[in-house]
Amino acid sequence: MTTIRPATPADLAAALDIYNAVYPDHAETLEETEHFLAGLRDNPLQPHVQDWLAEVGGRPVGTARLWQAPWMFHPDRYHLELAVLPEFRRRGIGAALFGTAQRHWQGRGAREVLAGAKETEADALPMLERRGFREVMRFFDNVLRLNGFDAAQWEAEMRLPEGVRAVTFADLQTELGEEAAWLAYYACQTEARLDVPRTAPPSEVALADFRNYRSKATFDPAGVWLAVTEAGEVVAMSELWRDLTNLERLNIGLTGTRRAWRRRGLGLALKLRGMVQAQQHGIREIWTSNASNNVPMLALNDRLGFRRQPAHVECQWGRAEDCRA
């Protein structure tokens, strides 16, 4: 017998085991998930989050989460994540979880829901289409195997323009002091992220939330490379995050440049420094994710030797009015 019930904090580990089994390339630790949920609870926007667990004979076999993203927030926009263990699929469990989540968002008056699946998941995308979702964007995981990366071929691209130097965030904190360094880093990220392709407009992220997100164990100040002017302004950035489920892998966060400094090769120069640093520390793989319409970044990653994986297809039901902070 299959039962669907609201999940409790005691179910978090079981739900995470299901998620990690279904999406091993994006596996998380329990600590990471707890940090993420705590960030949602503490966010001043008070984003909604609700989890459900599907059980067969008392065994957890599926999970769903309906939540709101503070970084692209609208009070009527939700995100749905759903996972069912492969050996329990085609039994109506995914449909039951979806129906439970759907009744929940209808009860809350949702006007937009975003959900998706890998293009290789034969059943998931047709299920979304039958329920009124339409494709709005694709995201590619790109993987670089560092054993084939030759830094010597990129020496020219690693040079920065006169008056700009590369420094890690860890070193910038030593130079400027912690508070000044955080402000400089935050100012760059706040502007650079505005033009990142996404399925909804970005909303403002407060400094406190920016810092809180980077208080988790995957953040490494020595893995954040910044381009800094003589005046101390951070004008470009490239982040490398630890992967706690695979210590031989790093994940690229945001690589971006402030608008006035673009088309000078700053982002590439910083990304290359991170790749060299990773190689020196015995890292075997670097992963990044790019939207299908981010053609320049996809082309650059192709040049660097990244290899595209099957796309994640993001789908949308309804549409909320754009909410810009």
Model-inferred region functions:
Residues 9-12, 19-120, 229, 234-249, ...:
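Conserved donor-binding loop and adjoining core beta-sheet/short helix segment
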Residues 42-46, 215-220:
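Short loop/turn motifs at secondary-structure junctions and domain boundaries
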Residues 90-103, 130, 257, 263-276, ...:
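Conserved acetyl-CoA-binding loop-helix of GNAT-fold acetyltransferases
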Residues 193, 197, 211, 219, ...:
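Oxyanion-binding "anion nests"
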Residues 59, 70, 86-93, 98-176, ...:
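Acyl-donor-binding surface of acyltransferase catalytic domains
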Residues 235-255, 260-273, 277-287:
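Extended hydrophobic/aromatic segments used for targeting, binding, or gating
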Residues 1-42, 51-55, 60, 157-205, ...:
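Short amphipathic alpha-helix that is part of the acyltransferase structural core
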Residues 131-150, 223, 252, 276, ...:
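Active-site/acyl-donor-binding loops of N-acyltransferases
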